[in-house]
Design a protein with these regions (language model features):
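Thiamine diphosphate
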Residues: 1-167, 171, 306, ...
């Protein structure tokens, strides 16, 4: 099997979709000659030309609106929002237009647009280039929200997002672009709404997203030294959410930790905790633990950034608390 980085897997999904379907095109700020801020689309201009690899003005609302219009007319645009923080500038179009047209038209109008964006900590980007805003969009009926954590998943889920007839907000974490793994020779679409169990265990379920999937896996290895068997589950798709997979795991382990890089208060983990509380309360042997960033803008200074966002040791501490081995 070939080995691809997360970045290469994103590009591969885009290239393959554009090769087989002329209705698929990409657009965004500096995505053509420059290849985007993270280099994901490098070389695609040479193969597909400026009509299908379209640089846009520096206006997220304008590029989102243009992408939505193209989708309504039957195209399948993939619009890159350079930084996740800049989704705030496109929110009117994504939330009030893309998410609403299918409902308002009684299903007569579909909006098959994918909004790719990236964010997160790890390289000291500062407070305005590193937010994790997935919870905002999970709250909006009509949107699908995807957050892959591995090259295999990002490739298969991006393909499925492009060919979904609903608008998808597709989150990528910048620190994952360099990770590599073997992927299937042929691209295998992954259905939206299906979670993935990365590691099986018996004592605690850790439900994690994005970068925190990898932190959770590291914490699970450390927990073995305590004699604790940890199951790590990645929802992959935040909306629709594979509630059954999450609940089944917690019913097996009887304990749950929810981890994400976004701020804890109001984060996606609160919704996951509510789902577990409603559907698996009688199986819980301990309170649900939540892990996330502190309630503060992300600092520019690397040492302060590391202090604000969660890491493997924070997940491990939560695991120990939920099994009663935190030393207290």
């Amino acid at each position: 099997m070939p080995e691809l980085s997360y970045r290469e897997a994103v590009r591969d999904a885009l290239v393959q979709a554009m090769r087989v379907d002329e209705d698929v095109f990409i657009m965004g700020e500096d995505i053509a000659e420059m290849g985007g801020s993270m280099g994901v689309t490098q070389g695609m201009l040479d193969e597909f030309g400026p009509e299908r690899v379209r640089n846009t003005p520096i206006s997220e609302m304008a590029l989102a609106g243009a992408a939505i219009g193209a989708a309504i007319q039957g195209m399948r645009p993939v619009a890159e929002i350079m930084y996740e923080d800049f989704l705030t500038l496109a929110t009117e179009q994504i939330v009030n237009q893309a998410a609403k047209h299918r409902y308002m038209s009684g299903g007569q109008v579909t909006v098959p647009v994918t909004f790719r964006t990236q964010g997160g900590s790890g390289w000291s980007p500062g407070a305005q280039h590193a937010q994790q805003l997935e919870a905002w969009f999970v709250h909006i009926p009509g949107l699908k929200v995807v957050f892959p954590s591995t090259p295999t998943d990002v490739r298969g889920l991006l393909w499925s997002s492009i060919y979904d007839d609903n608008p998808v907000v597709f989150f990528e974490h910048r620190t994952l672009y360099g990770i590599k793994e073997e992927v299937p020779e042929e691209l295998e679409p992954i259905p939206l709404g299906k979670a993935r169990v990365h590691r099986e265990g018996d004592d605690v379920t850790v439900i994690a997203t994005g970068r925190l999937v990898h932190e959770a896996l590291a914490a699970a290895k450390d927990a073995e030294n305590d004699g604790v068997s940890v199951e790590v589950v990645d929802p992959r798709t935040l909306q629709p959410l594979d509630e059954a997979a999450l609940v089944d795991s917690v019913k097996k382990t009887n304990r749950c930790v929810v981890a994400h890089e976004a701020v804890v208060r109001g984060g996606f983990g609160a919704e996951v905790a509510a789902v577990i509380q409603y559907q698996a309360f009688d199986w819980l042997d301990a309170p649900i633990e939540r892990v996330g960033a502190k309630f503060a803008p992300l600092p520019f200074a690397p040492v302060m950034e590391k202090f604000v966002v969660p890491h493997a040791n924070d997940v491990l501490d939560a695991i120990r608390r939920t099994v009663g081995r935190d030393g207290n």
